[in-house]
């Protein structure tokens, strides 16, 4: 029997050069997208942190961690949207047991 929903964790890094308003807009966009396709269990904004290595010649990024529950098909779509969104430097989605 197929799973109806599963728990996931998404971490994404936003380019801090977008400024406060730009970062807030990106965070709000993904919050709304996840809420429209599931439920947010936990949302943490870690703020600006030093990157382990340069990404696009930038030493820092704005980190956001979201734990959510959704249908198993949604994370693939979320990952696609992370990849095409300007300002998102890196993202990772994992399944939580």
Task: Describe these PLM feature segments.
Residues 2-97:
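Structured, basic alpha/beta domains of bacterial-type, RNA-associated proteins
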């Amino acid at each position: 029997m197929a799973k109806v929903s599963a728990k996931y964790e998404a971490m994404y890094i936003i380019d801090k050069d977008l400024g406060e308003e730009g970062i807030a807009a990106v965070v709000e966009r993904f919050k709304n997208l996840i809420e429209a396709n599931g439920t947010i269990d936990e949302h943490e904004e870690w703020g600006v942190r030093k990157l382990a290595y340069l990404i696009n010649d930038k030493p820092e990024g704005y980190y956001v961690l979201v734990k959510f529950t959704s249908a198993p098909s949604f994370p693939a779509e979320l990952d696609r949207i992370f990849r095409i969104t300007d300002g998102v430097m890196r993202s990772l989605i994992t399944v939580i047991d």
